[in-house]
UniProtKB/Swiss-Prot annotation:
It comes from Oedogonium cardiacum. Keywords: Chloroplast, Membrane, Photosynthesis, Photosystem II, Plastid, Reaction center, Thylakoid, Transmembrane, Transmembrane helix. It is a single-pass membrane protein. Its main location: plastid. Belongs to the PsbL family. One of the components of the core complex of photosystem II (PSII). PSII is a light-driven water:plastoquinone oxidoreductase that uses light energy to abstract electrons from H(2)O, generating O(2) and a proton gradient subsequently used for ATP formation. It consists of a core antenna complex that captures photons, and an electron transfer chain that converts photonic excitation into a charge separation. This subunit is found at the monomer-monomer interface and is required for correct PSII assembly and/or dimerization. GO terms for biological process: photosynthesis. SUPFAM superfamilies: Photosystem II reaction center protein L, PsbL. The lineage of its organism: Eukaryota, Viridiplantae, Chlorophyta, core chlorophytes, Chlorophyceae. This is Photosystem II reaction center protein L. It comes from the Eukaryota. GO terms for cellular component: chloroplast thylakoid membrane; photosystem II reaction center. Disulfide bonds: none annotated. PSII is composed of 1 copy each of membrane proteins PsbA, PsbB, PsbC, PsbD, PsbE, PsbF, PsbH, PsbI, PsbJ, PsbK, PsbL, PsbM, PsbT, PsbX, PsbY, PsbZ, Psb30/Ycf12, at least 3 peripheral proteins of the oxygen-evolving complex and a large number of cofactors. It forms dimeric complexes.
Amino acid sequence: MSQFDTNKLNEIDINKVSLSEVISRPNPNKQVVELNRTSLYWGLLLIFVLAVLFSSYIFN
């Protein structure tokens, strides 16, 4: 067996995976996203500062 044939055996055939198996599997990367008050204020400040900086381009 050549090196190409060995690599071919290790690959997963995507056509053999059914859609129901993909949907039923839980997402291992699912994490809770936290938005506390400090992050909210930093985000609002960032949006306000960017709005002030780009207002000259918008209202020109």
